[in-house]
Amino acid sequence: MSALIARQAPSAAERLADLAVQALVDEADLSPKPGLVDRRGSGAHSDLHLGLMHASAQSLWPAFAAMADAARSEGRVSQALRETLGQLGRDGEAEMLRVTAGVNTHRGAIWALGLLSAAAMLESGASAGGIAASAAALARLDDPAAPHNPDSHGARVCRRYGVLGAREQAQHGFPAVIEHGLPQLLASRRAGAGEQNARLDALLAIMSSLTDTCVLHRAGLEGLTRMQAGARAVLEAGGCASLAGRRRLRALEGEMLSLRASPGGAADLLAATLFLDRLTPAASAPIGSY
């Protein structure tokens, strides 16, 4: 008798959770990232390290699976689904904070990847843009139970500078991902940059266009302007696969460290980019089915 035991195939919700967690791990591992935690060190952070980022990502698997499964059960964008996703996201955040001893590692990623996981379940076979549009429809619905914290870093920055934050990025269909990160990832691959360089280029494309509230909080408008200009300079020099681009990347890293600023918003959206990029080829069956 065979010692092998047949294992039940993972559900669509479990596959989506796998993809979401893997996207977070891949983002954390990507190196060298200016100002961000990576395999070399903690970047501009004093309270984060790579092992903590990995543990945080793994802790979010149940929340992502539950959000995708809730979308499967509801079957459409609705107020009820929005409120369920909100509660599941808060539960996931509580578990993340338990695992990290109170350090906010992935709050923004829970928002972005939670919405996209649910939207991917609703939009079987859809393009990245179609999934992002469904996520936007969910994000535009109000969640009455969501805590209102006008003194959060993000809320204060948005008021002070009149910029859009993570909520509005989702409500507009993740333009930093759909219009910048994903096209750059695909273009750099086609140019033969290699996978790690293509992912770095995607991050830089997001950084060059995003009003990253994490950077605004730490370094103000001057810091944001320097980050965006530095990211554009890398891409204009040929990207991370070129010697000139790598020199520009080192210069940008020096600037981010001197500013003590980390583009955490861009990192979350790179994870969203990697999630959408891998969604179709990684699925062994149509998303939304068992």
UniProtKB/Swiss-Prot annotation:
Catalytic activity reported: 3'-dephospho-CoA + ATP = 2'-(5''-triphospho-alpha-D-ribosyl)-3'-dephospho-CoA + adenine
One Gene Ontology molecular-function label: ATP binding
Gene3D superfamilies, per the entry: Triphosphoribosyl-dephospho-CoA protein (1.10.4200.10)
Record has Cell membrane as a keyword: no
Keywords carried by this UniProt record: ATP-binding, Nucleotide-binding, Transferase
GO biological process terms, semicolon-separated: prosthetic group biosynthetic process
Entry's family note: Belongs to the CitG/MdcB family.
Protein name: Probable 2-(5''-triphosphoribosyl)-3'-dephosphocoenzyme-A synthase
Organism: Stutzerimonas stutzeri (strain A1501)
